[in-house]
Amino acid sequence: MEIASNKGVIADASTPAGRAGMSESEWREAIKFDSTDTGWVIMSIGMAIGAGIVFLPVQVGLMGLWVFLLSSVIGYPAMYLFQRLFINTLAESPECKDYPSVISGYLGKNWGILLGALYFVMLVIWMFVYSTAITNDSASYLHTFGVTEGLLSDSPFYGLVLICILVAISSRGEKLLFKISTGMVLTKLLVVAALGVSMVGMWHLYNVGSLPPLGLLVKNAIITLPFTLTSILFIQTLSPMVISYRSREKSIEVARHKALRAMNIAFGILFVTVFFYAVSFTLAMGHDEAVKAYEQNISALAIAAQFISGDGAAWVKVVSVILNIFAVMTAFFGVYLGFREATQGIVMNILRRKMPAEKINENLVQRGIMIFAILLGWSAI
């Protein structure tokens, strides 16, 4: 039923506009796609396409196309529904400042700090992985291209300076982070898509292979599930994204709609690009080439160089550097946002047990988290 108000006619309560207490025109204005929406789509894609993307075709080739297809049919819808549920849970929370506070609102402070700690541990592991990767890889490339005589990573201060710069960029605010990430993420996405397209001319239907026995098919599909899921997983950015929308929007319905829309767009782009990329390589190289690539520990880029004639080797060298550095940097940004939010939630949960919330200096807490993140990343190097 529509209700009249001084703002216009409020839409039926069964519609999103009605639940937000808005007319249809107000709802359309509130949910307009803007630069913030673009930024979160970019950050989500950047988080999903990590450095490991170049090894996905090898894993798919080893297991076979039928196994990957079954794994995709199971894994991708399940992950989509889980991420959708995750967003809805966060968006509905009365207090949406960080993941532990959301859990505290549903289950109490003790569960909030327990599940928040588990979430924190997951992000700490990724902080270790990407801090180490970006330090070692960047130093290796500088040495390979003759910029430095030795490896800068041998000095502990190189890693410290690098992590300080990355944390400073990540902490400057969404707009700067979105601007820096956009070019890198679009480059990664285009490289992955281009690699898939470059293989189309070498497709052979016999690389599809025969359908394996049902038991073996299911077993291998389950084994392949982690690779399938992590190929387009970006749950680390969902919590910071929902919190950002909740802080910007007065209406929970608007914040939820925008977060779900950003997730849907990112998921759709990732699914189409990554799925095509993996299938294209499998149809081009087949199982035997995948086994050789696995034994030699080479990536999809090196495989592409073997198939592409002419200046393939030179092209691969440049693209591999760009893809690897951009993948690690944008993934670090996404992980840091989640890490900062998780750490803040745990710290605030503990402090609120000791003192009134209004006496807590949140700016001081955030600065402390920055220092902690730098020291944590540095300790992993």
Across the structure, where does each feature detected by a protein language model lie?
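Hydrophobic transmembrane alpha-helices that form the core helical bundles
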Residues: 81-90, 96-102, 106, 110-149, ...
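Membrane-interface loop-to-helix entry segments
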Residues: 134, 138, 156, 160-199
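Membrane-interface "cap" regions at the ends of multi-pass membrane proteins
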Residues: 1-58, 80-84
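Loop-to-transmembrane helix boundary motifs in multi-pass membrane proteins
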Residues: 32, 37-39, 152-161, 254-255, ...
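TM-loop-TM module centered on a large, flexible mid-protein loop between adjacent transmembrane helices
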Residues: 97-109, 270-328
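Extracellular loop-to-transmembrane helix junctions
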Residues: 57-88, 100, 111
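Inter-helical loop and helix-membrane interface segments of multi-pass membrane transporters/permeases
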Residues: 29-30, 132-160, 206-219
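Hydrophobic, membrane-embedded alpha-helices of multi-pass small-molecule transporters
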Residues: 35-54, 119-123, 195-203, 211-281, ...
